[in-house]
Amino acid sequence: MAADVFMCSPRRPRSRGRQVLLKPQVSEDDDDSDTDEPSPPPASGAATPARAHASAAPPPPRAGPGREEPPRRQQIIHSGHFMVSSPHREHPPKKGYDFDTVNKQTCQTYSFGKTSSCHLSIDASLTKLFECMTLAYSGKLVSPKWKNFKGLKLQWRDKIRLNNAIWRAWYMQYLEKRKNPVCHFVTPLDGSVDVDEHRRPEAITTEGKYWKSRIEIVIREYHKWRTYFKKRLQQHKDEDLSSLVQDDDMLYWHKHGDGWKTPVPMEEDPLLDTDMLMSEFSDTLFSTLSSHQPVAWPNPREIAHLGNADMIQPGLIPLQPNLDFMDTFEPFQDLFSSSRSIFGSMLPASASAPVPDPNNPPAQESILPTTALPTVSLPDSLIAPPTAPSLAHMDEQGCEHTSRTEDPFIQPTDFGPSEPPLSVPQPFLPVFTMPLLSPSPAPPPISPVLPLVPPPATALNPPAPPTFHQPQKFAGVNKAPSVITHTASATLTHDAPATTFSQSQGLVITTHHPAPSAAPCGLALSPVTRPPQPRLTFVHPKPVSLTGGRPKQPHKIVPAPKPEPVSLVLKNARIAPAAFSGQPQAVIMTSGPLKREGMLASTVSQSNVVIAPAAIARAPGVPEFHSSILVTDLGHGTSSPPAPVSRLFPSTAQDPLGKGEQVPLHGGSPQVTVTGPSRDCPNSGQASPCASEQSPSPQSPQNNCSGKSDPKNVAALKNRQMKHISAEQKRRFNIKMCFDMLNSLISNNSKLTSHAITLQKTVEYITKLQQERGQMQEEARRLREEIEELNATIISCQQLLPATGVPVTRRQFDHMKDMFDEYVKTRTLQNWKFWIFSIIIKPLFESFKGMVSTSSLEELHRTALSWLDQHCSLPILRPMVLSTLRQLSTSTSILTDPAQLPEQASKAVTRIGKRLGES
């Protein structure tokens, strides 16, 4: 029988030399030629039609590589071939293949019989095939039609062998009426066969079009889909994978020129042997599904294939700022941390911005203009006259500071020789009248104070001039300040910075002592001659997105035909005399209202003081002038300790003064005292931009007005969000529970239906309930009417009865009732069924006592007959017995638990006996 089963497998060809010529790369166990090889018959010797395909010719001697091979017989078409054209054709031979593997012998010969005279040769590859068939068809088969063995990695010749075996098994079972050990067929139309035998055990869970939902099968199908095109390319190239790009280009031109070759279906492609190319691919899809690791953000600058259109994927990369010029960002980490620690408790919100190191000029010089620069227009009343008090003697010795080229924030600009000072008109004196002290060669105190007070700007008689803390004088100043005017806009970009400065103008910040009349201290900026060497270090603004609206006044940049000296008066701010030793100064004016966001102070390599007040309080009736002052220490002080940087963003408050805030800084550096309204950004009608906190990572910019959100507000927001989420979950749970209840009420089956169908059936169900309720209400109304009619009839009948009945004494009546109860008790204790009988006859006893009279024998005879006629007839007894049984069923457990009825009967007669004893 085993021979009959395995005869369907293709036999090894007799011409090995031709096999080598045609398919040198296929091993012997994968040979699929259908030329038969003779085998000795089994011990049974039964010749069956299953051997019709076997050849009885004796095997010729095997031809060596140099022998002449005999002519090959024409191939036999088996049943499993069906409509497959050229099922034995394999891909062309590859270069450098080992031809010795073709001559490998995989056939195993088995000897059996008493004298081992019978031999049977079985191909070893059939074992694997039948294992696959057992795995795929572990149940019963229905028909011998062609089976694709979906989900199994089989080649076409293996599928043909398996289908031949299945067809042979069907032939043996139905035509030869014999059993076979491989496959068994059942007929669904046969009534004796259980229907469950046709069900595949793997078909319990379906997934898409596959009837087996194992992950290995899904991965294998994914590999087929992934490697199909690459295998198509391998038809046109050798094993050298380096020529894959050239083949891609060749196929691309073939596509546009000669057109594509007609694609072969994936299942019929002879190249779909996934063992060949799985080593060339790294499976990343299912490995990431199993590990559940978060995908890292790709760095587009590390991708080598940015030029290939297939590698470019859409994303948020164009929205990211360019970080190439932020290579040296480490010095600002301490700046952020120290600023939050120092000023965290002073202001409700702080906005930190990276302040660059003035010693680090970048390699980019072309951002700043060097020729035509705008001038600054100021009111005439604010410009100092040429006859102002003598300025402090300034040391004109220039300072050339060293710089690092890797810092991209600092823009150096060389200044040429300064021009003569600009003459200013007289009206400056009434506003700023202060004598100037002579310079002192001694160094200033350790902690000078730089108060910043927003007073009324243009009022000649200010109502409340503030006092200053520690007014100092300029010591031996070895610096040459410069002035930069900076026009702020809503959005600052590094492409077109709105920055203008005077290239050939050096200005000296001079201060005056307060007059005895306590006039408001002002700041006069006068030009001074500078040597051609000092360099102004310019802080290039980083792109910052300012939210909160557009500024009130438009920003204009007026170009000048030539560099002109500029004289500036800083308005809306008071800067007390402070000592700056040995460093050149720069003043940057920023036009535009800025809300006070916070204070930033940290220690950097050079002493920098950044002061940016804007739109501070003004006197009534005076037009508002928005300005900001940036005082930057630009010197290269080798002997002085590092000084902090403080940036003040004043708010657009309307009240004159607020609480004074004093910020102590590190030793040796000037102190900055801020006196101003200490409150958050007011929600006023005017639009004023808010500076956003520049975080180190450009991925997460914070565009809120406050650079650092309040933890209480964050906690409240999270609490409110959690409440919203909880309420939403409760709402959805209630809706789901109500729909489940509706489904349980309106539908008998457990099949899930849509909400629309559920609501429609609910409406129908409610309508039916309303109709039933109306019918019940109508029935109750009708029954009430009948009860009223019956009560009226009973009352009318009772009115017709006589007022007196049979003359029976009360004592005699009670005595007869006691005798009846005693009799019932005695008989019930003997047999509990008598208690049921006593309940039935008790109405008869009552009627007997009322009708029968014992006054005389004739009267007794007459009343007894009358009682029998009236109360003992069947029409009277039937409803009486029925009512008695109804009372029995309601007062006892005769219907629910009849076993307790004897106990209840004994208890009833016992109660009757106790009542008799008490009476």
Curated annotation (Swiss-Prot):
Q: What would be an example GO MF term here?
A: protein dimerization activity
Q: Which Pfam families match?
A: HLH (PF00010)
Q: What does this protein do?
A: Binds DNA as a heterodimer with MLX and activates transcription. Binds to the canonical E box sequence 5'-CACGTG-3'. Plays a role in transcriptional activation of glycolytic target genes. Involved in glucose-responsive gene regulation.
Q: Which CDD domains match?
A: bHLHzip_MLXIP (cd19688), NES2-NLS_MLXIP (cd21772)
**By what name is this protein known?**
MLX-interacting protein
Q: Which organism is it from?
A: Homo sapiens
The UniProt annotation puts the region (Mediates heterotypic interactions between MLXIP and MLX and is required for cytoplasmic localization) at: 832-881
An annotated GO cellular component of this protein is:
nucleus
* Residue spans of biased composition, Acidic residues class: 27-37
Q: Where does this polypeptide localize? A: Cytoplasm; Nucleus; Mitochondrion outer membrane
Ranges for region Leucine-zipper:
769-790
Q: Which gene encodes it?
A: MLXIP
List the residue ranges of the region (Transactivation domain).
322-445
According to its UniProt entry, one GO biological process term is: regulation of transcription by RNA polymerase II
Q: Which PROSITE patterns match?
A: BHLH
Its keywords, alphabetically, are:
Acetylation, Activator, Cytoplasm, DNA-binding, Membrane, Mitochondrion, Mitochondrion outer membrane, Nucleus, Phosphoprotein, Transcription, Transcription regulation
